Amino acid sequence: MVFXLPNKNVIFVAGLGGIGLDTSREIVKAGPKNLVILDRVENPAAIAELQAINPKVTVTFYPYDVTVPLSESVKLLKTIFDKLKTIDLLINGAGILDDHQIERTIAVNFTGLVNTTTAILQFWDKRKGGPGGVIANICSVTGFNAIYQVPVYSASKAAVVSFTQSIAKLAPITGVTAYSINPGITKTTLVHKFNSWLDVEPRVAELLDEHPTQSTTACAQNFVKAIELNQNGAIWKLDVGRLDPVQWTKHWDSGI
C-alpha cells in the first residue's frame, strides 16, 4: 500500500545528520503535517531551514540519545503522542562508524534502534488497541556484504537488517510494518575519517573515498521514494543514485 506523506506525522531519529538532514528536507517538501526530529545535538539553524522549506509543516525538535534506557525512550514518545495523538511513520537513523568504539557502536547502531522500536510498539501495537504504524530503519549495504575492515560496524548493520525482517513478519500480529534502507557509500562526514577494527587498515576511509559514491541528496530522494512505495519487508539498496530491491536468499526456515 502506497504511503502518502501529505498530512502524516513523522518521527525521524537522527534527522539532522548527513543523509538524515537531506532526507528531512525531502520529507518536508512532500508536505507531512508534522516532522518530529529526535537527535543528540540540537541544530536550530537546520530546524529553521526545514521549517522555511515548507511553512505548512510543523517541524519540532527533541533531544534524544538512543543509548538511554528503554523507559526513557517510552517517556519521550509518550510526550510526543500526548501532543500529536498519532504518529504514522518512525524513521530510525542513528548510527556511528568507529570500530575502536565497540560497545558504543553496538549501542547506537543496534541496541538503541531496538529500544526505540520497542518503545513505539507500546503505542502502536494493535494487541494493545494501537493503530499500527510504519518503521523505516536506516541500515547499510554493509549489512549484507561487510566491509571487512570495519567488522563491528558491518555486523551491527547486519543485525538491524535481520531485526527489521522479523518486525516485518510480525506485522499480522502487531499491525506494524517495517523495511530497511541500505545506503551505499555516500558523501558524508561518516566516511571521511573513521577507525578500522584493531587498525587493520589505517587507510580504510581513504580507500572508500576511491569507490563510486553518491550524494546525500540523491540518497535522500530515493529514500523518500522508498517511503512512498511502503513495501513491508523490503530490503532497499540505495547506491550510486539508484533505488533497488534486494532479493534475500533463504538458506533455512524455522518452520514456525
From Swiss-Prot:
Annotated active site: 153
Domain of life: Eukaryota
Annotated keywords: NAD, Oxidoreductase
Catalytic activity: a primary alcohol + NAD(+) = an aldehyde + NADH + H(+); a secondary alcohol + NAD(+) = a ketone + NADH + H(+)
A Gene Ontology molecular function term of the record: alcohol dehydrogenase (NAD+) activity
Assembly and binders: Homodimer.
Keyword Zinc: no
Residues reported in the UniProt entry to bind substrate: 140
GO cellular component, one term: cytoplasm
Organism whose genome encodes this protein: Zaprionus tuberculatus
Coiled-coil intervals: none
Family: Belongs to the short-chain dehydrogenases/reductases (SDR) family.
Enzyme Commission designation: 1.1.1.1
InterPro entries: ADH_Drosophila-type (IPR002425), NAD(P)-bd_dom_sf (IPR036291), Sc_DH/Rdtase_CS (IPR020904), SDR_fam (IPR002347)
Broadest EC class assigned to this enzyme: oxidoreductase
Pfam families assigned to the protein according to its UniProt record, in alphabetical order: adh_short (PF00106)
GO biological-process terms attached to the record: alcohol metabolic process
Protein name as catalogued: Alcohol dehydrogenase
List of residues binding NAD(+): 12-35
